[in-house]
A protein has these predicted regions:
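Long amphipathic alpha-helical segments
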Residues: 1-92
Length: 93
């Protein structure tokens, strides 16, 4: 199984917010940042590690793709929305 922090970074990169959101189509029905962040907290991952190795790592990936003109503003906005969803769980820490 893929490391949960890597899964969070991948979901942020792809803009996968939660399981019920059908975007992106290839990840339909899979858990998103919302569920994975909660799972990481339940597994006692430090919030700072979830932030740096999960959420920020995913935004760095999408930022690199944007600089290389491989993605466009809508994809970056979906990634930002996904990161914000994860941040909602980390705000209490």
């Amino acid at each position: 199984m893929e490391n949960i922090l890597e899964q969070i970074a991948n979901c942020v990169d792809k803009g996968k917010i939660n399981r019920s959101v059908p975007y992106p189509p290839e990840m339909k029905g899979q858990p998103g940042v919302d569920e994975l962040t909660l799972q990481a907290l339940e597994l006692n991952f430090p919030p700072s590690e979830i932030l740096s190795k999960g959420l920020i790592a995913g935004m760095e990936r999408i930022g690199t793709k944007f600089r290389e003109n491989r993605v466009f503003v809508p994809q970056v906005l979906m990634s930002a929305k996904a990161m914000n969803c994860g941040m909602m769980h980390l705000k209490k820490f």
